[in-house]
UniProtKB/Swiss-Prot annotation:
Span of domain PABS: 5-241
GO function terms (MF aspect): spermidine synthase activity
Top-level taxonomic group: Bacteria
The keyword Nucleotide-binding belongs to this UniProt entry's keyword annotation: no
Protein's cellular compartments: Cytoplasm
Residues that, per the record, bind S-methyl-5'-thioadenosine: Q35, D110, D141, G142, P167
Any one annotated GO CC term: cytosol
Gene designation per UniProt: speE
Protein name as it appears in the record: Polyamine aminopropyltransferase
HAMAP family: Spermidine_synth (MF_00198)
Pathway(s) of this molecule: Amine and polyamine biosynthesis; spermidine biosynthesis; spermidine from putrescine: step 1/1
GO BP: any one term: spermidine biosynthetic process
Subunit (UniProt): Homodimer or homotetramer.
Pfam families: Spermine_synt_N (PF17284), Spermine_synth (PF01564)
Length: 285
């Protein structure tokens, strides 16, 4: 990574690529007990949040990620009532989850309270639901939280984490997935951000293998654009306890969803279920 008076550039070693943003100034920086969080003002992308030098989100394009990590899973589940979000400290995923009126409770557990406080200050539009009566914000270890979750008590677990290094490393292994499996009801869904399907298919396969070792039997990886992330193309992966689940979704409900989105639609959901041939081949779909 590098910065000068005009640009912030993140070098992403796993893909041998870099991404940069023209900046007009640095707004804030805080070193939490876990990581360094920085906020920049860009000239074209609104505000930019970095965690340990890695781009987390911008004002301009975060909706792709937040909508795709939440709505496909929520419309795939027959009637989601209790949702747990592990990570997600910027609160954008929580906001999308609570757009669904059938959700009765959404617990967000992020290890670093400072991420949420910085988001409330610089990305208040993402924090509209923080005081919703259905929302519970916890600042604790997500691995421990899932390990202590009551068996069969959760409809959807969303793992909205940073890359699998540092504080998030424990969210990408069999032990954590076993905790998720135990906490989910029989028709429950696990969904996790799964990096770039263009450059990191091996990592996606490793994730799915670890999920399978934990008991999950069916998987679906959904790609979507994410300009501020390496390669500009990202993904989430859904996992089900059911054998040969087709991940069909409640299309009528999605079409008549009754709330606004900037990217997600029922028609888009239908299309994204069909993986590009090179992705399908690599993932054995």
């Amino acid at each position: 990574m590098s910065a000068n008076d005009n640009w912030y550039i993140e070098h992403f070693q796993p893909t041998g690529s870099a991404i940069g943003f023209r900046i007009s100034g640095k707004l804030d920086e805080v070193q939490s007990p876990f990581q360094k969080i920085e906020i920049y003002q860009t000239t074209d992308w609104g505000k930019l949040m970095l965690i340990d030098g890695a781009v987390m989100l911008t004002s301009r394009d975060n909706f792709f990620y937040h909508e795709m990590i939440s709505h496909p899973a929520l419309f795939t589940h027959p009637a989601p009532k209790r949702v747990v979000i592990i990570g997600g400290g910027d609160c954008g995923t929580l906001r999308e989850v609570l757009k669904h009126p059938g959700v009765e409770s959404a617990t967000q557990c992020d290890i670093d309270e400072q991420v949420t406080r910085m988001s409330e200050k610089y990305f208040p539009e993402l924090c509209d639901s923080n005081h919703d009566a259905r929302a519970e914000l916890l600042f604790d270890d997500g691995v421990a939280y899932m390990a202590n979750c009551q068996a069969g008590s959760v409809d959807i677990v969303i793992v909205d984490s940073t890359d699998p290094v540092g504080p998030a490393e424990g969210l990408f292994n069999k032990a954590f997935y076993e905790s998720c499996f135990k906490a989910l009801k029989d028709d429950g869904i696990l969904v996790q951000q799964s990096e770039s399907p263009l450059a990191l298919l091996d990592l996606i396969n490793e994730m799915r293998t670890e999920m399978g070792k934990a008991g999950f039997q069916s998987f679906k990886t959904l790609p979507f654009p994410q300009p501020c992330y390496p390669t500009g193309w990202w993904s989430v992966t859904m996992a089900s306890k059911q054998a040969k689940a087709d991940f069909a979704f409640r299309q009528d409900a999605a079409q008549a969803k009754g709330f606004d989105t900037l990217y997600y639609t029922a028609h888009l959901h239908t299309g994204v279920l069909v993986a590009p041939p090179f992705v399908a081949k690599a993932l054995g779909e």
